[in-house]
A protein has these predicted regions:
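Membrane-integral, polyisoprenol-dependent glycosyltransferases
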Residues: 1-296, 303-336
Length: 336
């Protein structure tokens, strides 16, 4: 993928930059004008009320019916700063909708100057986007997080900047804290980057398919290919814990198990033995000067996947074993 400099050329002209500033300012005005005159929708009333409870010091308890906690904490902060009213209940949505307009400026490397400016224009005047930017629900907030995910991951693919991955990781985390629809977002990006990874590996390998595997397992090159997948998959992996509740119950532990005794006596011994074996193997590999390879990665992967997904064991050994497995899985020769 061509880098941003190759696609956009020189810095934007003052008129182009001014157009984004004007559209963003106009979008803000359209979203703030008469913001509190319309009666609150049922969903808006729930978000406004429970955020007000938090603002009043009555605490917050997560309820999946109203999705993630981000909106309630952000609205409570807005109440603290600007007071509580129907207008301030919608202020978060208005700000996110406005920020999405300005963010189109950074889409120029991929949409082109005309395309990015057109996107900003459409976001400014779109009746649907304008409506949800004046609606105290998570729709426009999620749309803004998704736009930041696109900007972060696409910029990383183009320029390999760690800051771009941090942006994407933050947006994914905030997306999960806002609404469960982020599962779908992660699935879309995961499929895309998985297919892109395969294409790049086979292009780099040429007529030798084994070269693709060597690239994927190379300590020097693997991070460049796998970092977006690690961000997308790693942040979302613990969110899929419900998918292992039934298998855990079949094994005799977890909240769905018929026996309330949890965990079973053998769970700690089994997990500790596996973690110890992985750490011992990785230390031995480091002493022998062996770089981490496919075999070691495959050995660590199941343990690293099961522990974030499994119903949480008691804290006194959960963190210890998880850290031993994940950080001990790479031999010392790979740390420096």
């Amino acid at each position: 993928m061509a880098g941003p400099a190759e696609r956009t050329g020189a810095s934007p002209a003052p008129a182009e930059l001014g157009a984004y500033v004007a559209l963003t300012a106009l979008g803000l005005g359209l979203r703030l004008y008469d913001l509190g005159s319309r009666a609150l929708h049922h969903d808006e009333s729930l978000h406004a009320l429970f955020a007000w409870y938090l603002y009043q010091g009555r605490g917050y308890a997560h309820d999946p019916m109203m999705h993630g906690p981000f909106q309630f904490h952000a609205l409570a902060l807005i109440y603290f700063l600007f007071g509580d009213s129907d207008a301030t209940a919608r202020l978060l949505a208005a700000l996110c909708g406005t920020a999405a307009i300005g963010a189109c400026y950074w889409l120029r490397p991929w949409l082109g100057r005309i395309g990015a400016l057109t996107a900003a224009l459409l976001l400014t005047f779109s009746p649907i986007m304008l409506y949800f930017s004046r609606f105290a629900r998570n729709d426009i907030i999620i749309a803004f997080w998704n736009l930041l995910i696109v900007l972060g991951l696409w910029d990383y693919v183009a320029r390999r900047r760690p800051a771009a991955l941090i942006l994407a990781a933050g947006a994914i985390g905030l997306g999960f804290a806002t609404k469960e629809v982020t599962f779908i977002t992660v699935a879309i990006f995961g499929v895309f980057f998985g297919l892109r990874l395969l294409r790049e590996l086979f292009e780099a390998a040429g007529p030798d398919p084994a070269a693709a595997l060597r690239t994927l397992t190379s300590p020097a090159k693997a991070p460049l290919y796998l970092a977006p997948l690690v961000v997308v998959g790693g942040l979302s992996l613990p969110q899929f814990s419900a998918g292992v509740e039934l298998p855990a119950a079949w094994l005799g532990f977890g909240p769905l198990a018929p026996n309330p005794a949890y965990p079973p006596p053998w769970a700690g011994l089994a997990a500790g033995g596996l973690a110890g074996a992985l750490v011992a193997g990785s230390l031995g590999a480091g002493l022998l000067g062996i770089r981490p390879g496919l075999a070691l990665g495959l050995a660590v992967l199941p343990f690293g996947a099961v522990f974030p997904l499994a119903p949480a064991p008691p804290d006194h050994f959960q963190g210890l074993l998880l850290n031993l497995a994940l950080y001990g899985g790479a031999p010392p020769s790979a740390w420096g």
